[in-house]
Amino acid sequence: MEKYSFESVQELSLRPNVWEEYIGQEKIKKNLKVFIEASKKRKECLDHILFFGPPGLGKTTLSHIIAHEMGCNIKVSAAPMIEKSGDLAAILTNLNEGDILFIDEIHRLSPAIEEILYPAMEDFRLDIIIGSGPAAQTLKIDLAPFTLIGATTRAGMLSNPLRDRFGMSFRLQFYEPKELSAIVICASSKLGRSLSKSGADEIARRSRGTPRIALRLLRRVRDFADVGEYAQDMRNQSEISLECVRYALNELGVNELGFDELDLRYLAILAESRGKAIGLNTIAAAMSEDEATIEDVIEPYLLANGYLERTAKGRVASPKTYELLHIPFLEQKGLF
């Protein structure tokens, strides 16, 4: 059910397995610990959980830690892989009592699949319709009690009936720089490389509040420290220095705010509109990117940090964007 690229395998090796290793999201951790202990005390399955928020904040990692703390198996799937009722039935009927089913991108489940999921979540029962028309029959299959953990970057796209069936719902927040710095230092030791505190702080500052980005940048910094042009200067150093980190991140095109070429291109398009709202489809066409990438990857951090505003008519650059691009609001010229 799970398929990993080489990069994702590396990410798995850096993933915390217990609460003590998991940094950040303190309020969520505190509540989950209570709910897990209560379920274990009553010898019941944990109630169904929904995690939502921007990508890369630890939804999958939290799910694996929950499974570890509950002492149960976790089976991982993604909504696009569950195309037919038979796909979901095969997954659910193979779950043992107390198992966790993690479905990523759960907002992409089709309405037909959702209909099958409702009784499974509420009554641990599958209702399968066999045949069609007047001769159609409903086959009821009892399921072992299980916990469904859904993850999504678009909670607003979940249907109300599905959302209401989750007993717990948590929104993951962007991380503070000090939390990301601690994550990077811990990960660097797992990678077998020592990283200076100032170097970890620099990676954290340019990671857009996102652990996944911080870990990706750390791996690329390590590459530059090992074999890049800066490697020769690293031979007599016991740890990766701040200077090496800055060199690597600058070479990667990640500026001091964590913005790359795609982010700056997006902001430039907004700024060129001279304060007029621009529709998402227009921005996507101008950037040659799909709308989902813009909504899920580019916009969340920019929105959270006040670089744009969403209105009924579209996206509008904030004064902060004009300041970043050094463009006086009333004197905007063509940027391209």
Swiss-Prot record:
Residue sites binding ATP per the record: 14-15, 56, 59-61, 122-124, 165, 175, 212
Q: Which reaction does it catalyse?
A: ATP + H2O = ADP + phosphate + H(+)
Q: Which InterPro entries match?
A: AAA+_ATPase, AAA_lid_4, DNA_helicase_Holl-junc_RuvB, P-loop_NTPase, RuvB-like_N, RuvB_C, WH-like_DNA-bd_sf, WH_DNA-bd_sf
The Swiss-Prot or TrEMBL record annotates one GO molecular function as: four-way junction helicase activity
- Binding-site residues for DNA, renumbered to this chain: 310, 315
Q: Could you tell me which residues belong to the region Large ATPase domain (RuvB-L)?
A: 1-175
Any single Gene Ontology cellular-component annotation: cytoplasm
Q: Name one GO biological process term.
A: DNA recombination
Q: Where is this region: Small ATPAse domain (RuvB-S)?
A: 176-253
User: EC number(s) on record?
Assistant: 3.6.4.-
What would be one Pfam family of this protein? RuvB_N
Q: Does the keyword Hydrolase apply?
A: yes
Q: Where is this region: Head domain (RuvB-H)?
A: 256-336
Q: What is known of its domains?
A: Has 3 domains, the large (RuvB-L) and small ATPase (RuvB-S) domains and the C-terminal head (RuvB-H) domain. The head domain binds DNA, while the ATPase domains jointly bind ATP, ADP or are empty depending on the state of the subunit in the translocation cycle. During a single DNA translocation step the structure of each domain remains the same, but their relative positions change.
Q: How would you summarize the oligomeric state and partners of this protein?
A: Homohexamer. Forms an RuvA(8)-RuvB(12)-Holliday junction (HJ) complex. HJ DNA is sandwiched between 2 RuvA tetramers; dsDNA enters through RuvA and exits via RuvB. An RuvB hexamer assembles on each DNA strand where it exits the tetramer. Each RuvB hexamer is contacted by two RuvA subunits (via domain III) on 2 adjacent RuvB subunits; this complex drives branch migration. In the full resolvosome a probable DNA-RuvA(4)-RuvB(12)-RuvC(2) complex forms which resolves the HJ.
What function does this protein fulfil? Answer: The RuvA-RuvB-RuvC complex processes Holliday junction (HJ) DNA during genetic recombination and DNA repair, while the RuvA-RuvB complex plays an important role in the rescue of blocked DNA replication forks via replication fork reversal (RFR). RuvA specifically binds to HJ cruciform DNA, conferring on it an open structure. The RuvB hexamer acts as an ATP-dependent pump, pulling dsDNA into and through the RuvAB complex. RuvB forms 2 homohexamers on either side of HJ DNA bound by 1 or 2 RuvA tetramers; 4 subunits per hexamer contact DNA at a time.
**PANTHER family given in the database record:** HOLLIDAY JUNCTION BRANCH MIGRATION COMPLEX SUBUNIT RUVB (PTHR42848:SF1), PTHR42848
The record's similarity note reads: Belongs to the RuvB family.
- Which protein is depicted? Holliday junction branch migration complex subunit RuvB
Please tell me the species this chain comes from: Helicobacter hepaticus (strain ATCC 51449 / 3B1)
Which gene name does the record give? ruvB
